[in-house]
């Protein structure tokens, strides 16, 4: 079991790949990558199945998707454990991920009907009908940080709309993908409707460049997303939905309950070991005694964050990062900021060689004139002290990204002022900025996306509108146009 094509499991014909548990360096999955020929076979299977899948109708498609939900519920413990082992996230967190996958079914069905259903109105010219049709064959590229929930958020609405899908997961989480697709198979999904190809860059390039794709839905790094955007330039007939990262700001202003503020900062910056695209990367705190008190409490709390393997008891708040390479990258990012003038208040450290386990870091970068506009994808929060609110907002907007932003403030006026001026697709007030709702759109501006918001708005990029004016019979108008005679 490695690749799923035309309703059958196939071994890969490419080179060997393995999945490593980043918390203990143990191999938990092995296989071979898909070749270009196997990618072709997957696309051909999806093309062959697409029209019949569409013609089943929404209700029949929904019944199969709901059968998949039943499979998720029946296998949620195994799926949560698989996600935990492959990503290093603690078990409490992967259980919530599987819960989000289950909840996505009802949300996607509601979004289909609200965003892309059918609407008819009688007009003097006839019956005006708006329908939505699937694009056809689409690819879904999944990330490693939420290897179940995020690709699920593309696949479910795509299938409900009548598309067929080729799923290419992250090469770091193949076991989760294999288990997910096996649950679709058990749900009775017709052959060819969902296909799985595993692999690294070569497999991804073969799929992304395939001429028979009608669209591609991507969640991942800004670098890869920009490459895909360039690749799709000159192909206006193909739909491209990009969900990328962010260099996200969180501003603190005039908060009396600093303990609650510290809690929201921790949840914004360090959950998932900082490996959420919405995580706070930059923290702006007012100068003065109140700001000093908040920072002292924050630094103490960061030092107390429990870090450990996915299965540690009692459970840690932070598990492993996705790999040892990622952990070393965060140490290097911290060193770079220190060399530029940053002062570590809490040092991020690589806890165990061969693993992705790191301790969280907090670094004061106020003295750095121009901060690197980078998404450091890990548990390292950059602190900036500010003198006035306008300065804080200006600094917060100094990024090419625009995914999430937040304000912790007791004043509603301050929030309204902030909301009008901040540039981001997700803006929260007195809530962690990693707390997105599946009943709302999810997406950013700038280098964070291409204006194809996902979550509840994923239905929008899974179908295109068809406008019709209809009548039950051909009929002459009461008055002919000038110059006509019959």
From Swiss-Prot:
Its EC number is 1.2.1.71. GO terms for biological process: arginine catabolic process to glutamate; arginine catabolic process to succinate. It catalyses: N-succinyl-L-glutamate 5-semialdehyde + NAD(+) + H2O = N-succinyl-L-glutamate + NADH + 2 H(+). One of its GO terms (molecular function) is succinylglutamate-semialdehyde dehydrogenase activity. The active site is at 243, 277. Pfam families: Aldedh. It is an enzyme of class 1 (oxidoreductase). The keyword NAD applies. Belongs to the aldehyde dehydrogenase family. AstD subfamily. This is N-succinylglutamate 5-semialdehyde dehydrogenase. It comes from Shewanella baltica (strain OS155 / ATCC BAA-1091).
């Amino acid at each position: 079991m490695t690749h799923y094509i035309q309703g059958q499991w196939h071994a890969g014909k490419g080179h060997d790949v393995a999945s490593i548990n980043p918390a203990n360096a143990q191999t938990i999955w092995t296989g071979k990558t898909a070749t270009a020929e196997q990618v072709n076979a997957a696309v051909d299977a999806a093309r062959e199945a697409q029209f019949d899948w569409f013609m089943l109708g929404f209700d029949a498609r929904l019944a199969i998707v709901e059968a998949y939900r039943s499979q998720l519920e029946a296998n949620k413990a195994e799926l949560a454990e698989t996600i935990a082992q492959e990503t290093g996230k603690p078990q409490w967190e992967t259980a919530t991920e599987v819960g989000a996958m289950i909840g996505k079914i009802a949300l996607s069905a509601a979004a289909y009907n609200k965003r892309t259903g059918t609407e008819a109105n009688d007009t003097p010219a006839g019956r005006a009908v708006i329908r939505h049709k699937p694009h056809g064959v689409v690819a879904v590229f999944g990330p490693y940080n939420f290897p179940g929930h995020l690709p699920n958020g593309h696949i479910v609405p795509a299938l409900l709309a009548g598309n067929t899908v080729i799923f290419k997961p992250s090469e770091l989480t193949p076991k989760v993908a294999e288990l997910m697709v096996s649950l679709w198979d058990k749900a009775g999904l017709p052959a060819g409707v969902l296909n799985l190809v595993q692999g690294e860059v070569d497999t991804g390039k073969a799929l992304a460049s395939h001429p028979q794709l009608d669209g591609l839905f991507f969640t991942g790094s800004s670098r890869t997303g920009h490459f895909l955007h360039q690749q799709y330039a000159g192909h206006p007939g193909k739909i491209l939905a990009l969900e990328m990262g962010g260099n996200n700001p969180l501003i603190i202003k005039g908060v009396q309950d600093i303990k609650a503020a510290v809690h929201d900062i921790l949840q914004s910056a360090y959950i998932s070991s900082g490996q959420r695209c919405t995580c706070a990367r930059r923290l702006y705190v007012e100068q003065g005694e109140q700001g000093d008190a908040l920072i002292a409490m924050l630094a103490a709390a960061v030092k107390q964050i429990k870090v450990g393997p996915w299965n540690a008891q009692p459970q840690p708040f932070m598990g492993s990062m996705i790999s040892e390479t990622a952990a070393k990258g965060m140490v290097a990012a911290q060193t770079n900021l220190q060399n530029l003038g940053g002062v570590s208040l809490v040092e991020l450290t690589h806890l165990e060689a061969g693993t992705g386990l790191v301790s969280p870091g907090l670094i004061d970068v106020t003295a750095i004139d121009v901060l690197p506009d980078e998404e450091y994808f890990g548990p390292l929060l950059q602190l900036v002290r500010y003198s006035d609110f306008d300065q804080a907002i200006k600094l917060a907007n100094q990024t090419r990204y625009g995914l999430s932003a937040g304000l912790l403030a007791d004043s509603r006026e301050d929030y309204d002022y902030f909301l009008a001026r901040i540039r981001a697709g997700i803006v929260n007030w007195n809530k962690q900025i990693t707390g997105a709702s599946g009943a709302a759109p999810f997406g950013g501006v700038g280098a964070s996306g291409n204006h194809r918001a996902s979550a509840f708005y994923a239905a929008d990029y899974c179908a295109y509108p068809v406008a019709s004016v209809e009548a039950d019979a051909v009929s002459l108008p009461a008055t002919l146009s000038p110059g006509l005679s019959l």
